[in-house]
Curated annotation (Swiss-Prot):
It is found in: Cytoplasm. The gene is panB. Homodecamer; pentamer of dimers. Pathway: Cofactor biosynthesis; (R)-pantothenate biosynthesis; (R)-pantoate from 3-methyl-2-oxobutanoate: step 1/2. Mg(2+) binds at residues 46, 85, 117. It comes from Alkaliphilus metalliredigens (strain QYMF). Keywords: Cytoplasm, Magnesium, Metal-binding, Pantothenate biosynthesis, Transferase. Catalyzes the reversible reaction in which hydroxymethyl group from 5,10-methylenetetrahydrofolate is transferred onto alpha-ketoisovalerate to form ketopantoate. This is 3-methyl-2-oxobutanoate hydroxymethyltransferase.
Length: 282
């Protein structure tokens, strides 16, 4: 079993131009499969609101939701760097709130770090959490918790003025003490500049090549059917496999073809003894 990565390992990988591959996971089996496949990191994202809980966005997701799913992922991937995603409302109010909730992630869910969205507007939060001894990953570009302010789930940094803000935000996140940065739905030219400019690792989700790549597991596995982002490559169609399996099961149950003799437990005493037993209750 591979040794869990450390922040020092991730920094060394950036310097060596070695890519980091990671995915989201929200449950024990997916986390276990991801670890077996050699993923260096797993994000328990607030995207669980959409891909697991059926919400229209990430806003309704609670701390309890995130912690519960982080606990399941940690049990499934004990040797993988696990990132707890701070949900909407867990860090927006104050630095004290942010630290308190980040501590909950570390103590209750046994994550290795937390992630929060935003640049300049959350610099005091990042600083406060890191001052408390908790590693922080930043997140800029398309930030789902702020999608309403961004005009929906749209790519960011496609114009010079917006790209300038993203670059400034990236520098602020690093200066505030974050150990890494996730950039989402940003043109690769901008992402590359940020990755080259920053000393900390810069990871991409739909933002082109940099120090590593993140994808939503439900998207890459073809499980989430509401929509598929442009940047997703489907490596499987699990939804089709599961649906067909369910259909076959329904058909066999209706036709009396399941269960067969192979799928039942057989009695250990004689049939006659059981017949006597049944007679007692008639």
């Amino acid at each position: 079993m591979a040794k869990k990565k450390s922040i020092l390992d991730l920094m060394k990988m950036k310097k060596a131009e070695e890519q980091v591959a990671w995915v989201t996971a929200y449950d024990f089996p997916t986390a276990s499969f991801a670890e077996q496949a050699g993923m260096e990191m797993i994000l328990v994202g607030d995207s669980l609101g959409m891909v697991v809980l059926g919400y229209q966005g990430t806003i309704p997701v609670t701390m309890e939701d995130c912690i519960s799913h982080c606990q399941a992922v940690r049990r499934g991937a004990p040797n993988t760097w696990v990132i707890g995603d701070m949900p909407f409302g867990s860090y927006q109010v104050s630095d004290e709130d942010a630290v308190r909730n980040a501590v909950r992630f570390m103590k209750e869910a046994d994550v290795d770090c937390i992630k929060l969205e935003g640049g300049d507007r959350v610099k005091s939060r990042i600083r406060a959490i890191t001052d408390a001894g908790i590693p922080v990953m930043g997140h800029i570009g398309l930030t789902p918790q702020s999608s309403g302010q961004l005009g929906g789930f749209k790519a960011q940094g496609r114009r010079v003025d917006n790209a300038r803000v993203l670059i400034q935000d990236a520098l602020v996140v690093q200066e505030a003490g974050a150990f890494s940065l996730l950039v989402e739905a940003v043109p690769p030219e901008v992402t590359k500049f940020i990755a080259d400019k920053l000393d900390i690792p810069v990871y991409s989700i739909g933002a082109g090549p940099c120090d590593g790549q993140l994808v939503i597991s439900g998207d890459m596995l073809g499980k989430f059917q509401a929509f598929t982002p442009k940047f997703i490559k489907k490596y499987a169609n699990v939804a089709e496999v599961e649906t067909n399996a369910f259909k076959e099961y329904v058909a066999e149950v209706k036709a009396g073809q399941f269960p067969t003799d192979d799928h039942v437990y057989h009695i250990l005493d004689t049939q006659e003894e059981f017949e006597k037993l049944f007679q007692e209750f008639k």
